[in-house]
């Protein structure tokens, strides 16, 4: 009996750690990840302004697992029906039960020039590249323009970091920062009160917001947009262009994010968890792609894989075991906006120091849950100083 977890983001790490406890002793467990570290992705934007945070948000994979075998390789393809995985080395892995936790890639929608000229934020290296370019622009001493495409949480956080970086470098008055969003508001997938508070925090930092505005093209020095309602086009100068405008499935899934429902089961042998899938929960609600959702979905997925493995090892007689449904209850939402933050818990929205403290506690709580107490302490210090 072999269980395989593909990907070591929030979903993969959480699921594999739970399987270490839940799988029958006779089962083998493998986790496959291209990198040898686990990244606390929701903090990576901080490295644009605070490179010192890197140590706190990168965790060696080998330190996270007691039972699972860690394979450092890129997943090239997955046959979710047969349970065969092809790695970049040409080697194949077969599983009896597998979990697709490959996360998502940045989507470019075939927009001319966007992939070529738009910086993305998926890694510490990406954050370092954005920081280097921002400092180059600042160091010219000339007026300059920064454009961020996409005003979901990632775009909001990038715009906030760049505005605060420019302020810390004494250049904010000559650096224009524009945040573009195709839908009607910033943070469009979130509650209205949260959206309003985020917009206020952005406005306080003189970040110009263009909603109902789609990016149609990018060059080395400009971004072309079109207003969704009027059809009017505009060209914005862009000395730095960052693209956070959407997600697509991993290359191993041919860019697809398959739909899974309450039991998170894609096929008889394969489950899909986290950003790798479009999840519809037990209440019929679409689950947002987020760290919180990925971590929470990993628990029922692990329970279901373990139950099926135990049933099969016992002979597989009779009906399959009843699987645990996933029901997503959002505990709240938090986003940093430069040196500020916005948090919503229930109906209440808070900003300022309380929100910053909550932001720090979320990251630290996650690191502590994976036994990285020292890194959790480091992260709290970095967040509260940000």
Each language-model region and where it sits:
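A Rossmann-like FAD-binding core segment of flavoenzymes
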Residues: 70-77, 93, 167-262
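C-terminal, flexible cofactor-proximal segment of oxidoreductases
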Residues: 297-386
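Short glycine-enriched, charge-decorated loop/helix-capping segments at active-site entrances
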Residues: 44-51, 115-120, 284-291, 349-353
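Catalytic nucleophile loop
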Residues: 9-12, 152-155, 294, 302
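FAD-binding core/adjacent interface of flavoenzyme oxidoreductases
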Residues: 67-144, 149, 242
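Beta1-alpha1 glycine-rich phosphate/pyrophosphate-binding loop at the start
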Residues: 1-69, 157-190
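Rossmann-like NAD(P)H-binding beta-loop-alpha module
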Residues: 130-177
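FAD-site-proximal beta/loop scaffold in flavoenzymes
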Residues: 116-142, 221-222, 235-307
């Amino acid at each position: 009996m072999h269980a395989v977890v593909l990907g070591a983001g929030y979903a993969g790490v959480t699921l594999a750690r739970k399987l270490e406890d839940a799988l029958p002793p006779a089962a083998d467990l493998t986790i496959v990840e291209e990198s040898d570290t686990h990244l606390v992705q929701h903090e990576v934007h901080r490295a644009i302004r605070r490179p010192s945070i890197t140590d706190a948000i990168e965790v060696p994979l080998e330190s996270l697992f007691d039972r699972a075998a860690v394979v450092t390789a890129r997943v090239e393809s997955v046959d979710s029906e047969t349970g065969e995985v092809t790695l970049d080395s040409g080697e194949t892995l077969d599983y009896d039960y597998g979990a697709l936790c490959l996360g998502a890639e940045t989507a470019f929608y075939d927009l001319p020039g966007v992939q070529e000229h738009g910086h993305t934020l998926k890694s510490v290296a990406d954050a370092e590249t954005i920081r280097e370019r921002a400092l180059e622009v600042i160091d010219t001493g000339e007026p300059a323009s920064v454009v961020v495409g996409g005003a979901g949480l990632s775009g909001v956080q990038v715009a906030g970091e760049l505005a605060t970086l420019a302020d810390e470098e004494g250049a904010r008055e000559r650096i224009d920062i524009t945040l573009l969003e195709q839908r009607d508001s910033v943070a469009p997938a979130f509650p209205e009160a949260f959206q309003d508070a985020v917009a206020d925090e952005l406005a306080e930092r003189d970040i110009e917001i263009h909603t109902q505005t789609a990016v149609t093209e990018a060059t080395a020095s400009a971004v072309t947009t079109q207003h969704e309602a009027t059809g009017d086009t505009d060209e914005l100068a862009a000395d730095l262009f960052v693209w956070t405008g959407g997600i697509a499935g991993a290359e191993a899934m041919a860019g697809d994010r398959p739909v899974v429902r309450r039991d998170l089961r894609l096929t008889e042998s394969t489950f899909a968890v986290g950003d790798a899938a479009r999840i519809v929960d037990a209440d019929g609600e679409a689950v947002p792609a987020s760290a919180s959702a990925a971590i929470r979905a990993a628990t029922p997925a692990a329970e279901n894989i373990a139950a099926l493995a135990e049933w099969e090892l016992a002979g597989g007689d009779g009906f399959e075991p009843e699987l645990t449904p996933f029901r997503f209850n959002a505990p709240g939402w938090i986003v940093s906006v430069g040196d500020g933050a916005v948090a919503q818990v229930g109906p209440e929205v808070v900003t300022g120091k309380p929100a910053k403290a909550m932001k720090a506690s979320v990251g630290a709580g996650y690191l502590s849950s994976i036994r990285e107490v020292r890194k959790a302490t480091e992260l709290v210090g970095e967040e509260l100083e940000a």
